Amino acid sequence: MTTSAQSSIVNRKSKIGIYWSLTKPLQSGLLLATGLAGYMSARCPIFNMGTILGLTVSLFLAIAGSTVLNMWWDRDIDAKMGRTQKRATSSGAVDENEVLRVGLILSIIGVGIAVAMDALYGLLVFAGLFFDVVVYSIWLKRRTAWSIVWGGISGAMPILAGRALGLGFIDWIGVTLALGILFWIPTHTLTFSMKFEKDYAAACVPTFPSTYGLGFTRATIAVSSVLAALAMVVAGYGIGMDWGFLRLLGVLSAGLLMLAVAITFKPSERVNFGLFKYASVYMLAAMILVVIEVM
């Protein structure tokens, strides 16, 4: 193999790695897990591997595509924040027009597969992408701290879409699961915005801490945590979870509530970071419980 050929392979692998990082694989993976859990919560034939594969591919591509498009749109403000300055989009490591094309291609293929599988499922997947890219990132993120609500709606769509795919319609359990995600997202994102408050201020991005103060932000986290835990337990009961699984979900929810109370009355960097990490563990564990219970 010639030196130029070897260099080409290395460059190709490097670019693939860059684009993989732009999809935020951990975040995208968590949202994908909610979609799969939503589908399985419908107690449909979960071992229909064709449907599961289609759901996995369509959701991941749509989520990854929207994330790449967000990176493309936010490249100017990312360049002003210390934690995001080294992203490929903000550092100029990749061509911005190429990033746009990749984001659009991933999004179109993902939504296209979803629509081909089921019209309602495809509509919900598209709605999640639209709320994330257009409503949240392009329209509201630089204008209001309440943009996280609309970002939360986007994050709630995968689980609603997954359950709708399994049932063929939207029911109250699917809506409750989606509300659990919607209320969980402020717990996750507001702790993050508190930690990086100066970064967001440098980029002139309005956040709850900069707009309403830390006290109101902590109170919002506490309220959203209570609502998220309540919604998940109610949805679990509606699904028909065994009492053993419900008790486990209750224990997980109690942990979330304890940290939310701690950050309200005894705030510290340690508690803030602990809640940020636990929020992700809580949601992933809740989704795993749903999947295990119905199998």
Annotate each predicted stretch with a short phrase.
Residues 33-37, 41-75, 82-83, 107, ...:
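Membrane-embedded alpha-helical segments that form the functional core of polytopic membrane enzymes
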Residues 101-144, 221-278:
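Transmembrane helix-loop-helix
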Residues 22-41, 156:
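The first (N-terminal) embedded transmembrane alpha-helix
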Residues 160-170, 228-235, 283-295:
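Hydrophobic alpha-helical transmembrane segments in multi-pass integral membrane proteins
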Residues 17-27, 88-99, 135-154, 207-219, ...:
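Interhelical loop and helix-boundary elements at the membrane-water interface
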Residues 67-105, 109-110, 183-239:
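Solvent-exposed interhelical
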Residues 61-68, 131-137, 179-197, 229, ...:
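Transmembrane alpha-helical segments that form the membrane-embedded catalytic/substrate-channel core
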Residues 1-16:
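Short, basic, low-complexity termini and linkers enriched in Ser/Thr/Gly/Pro
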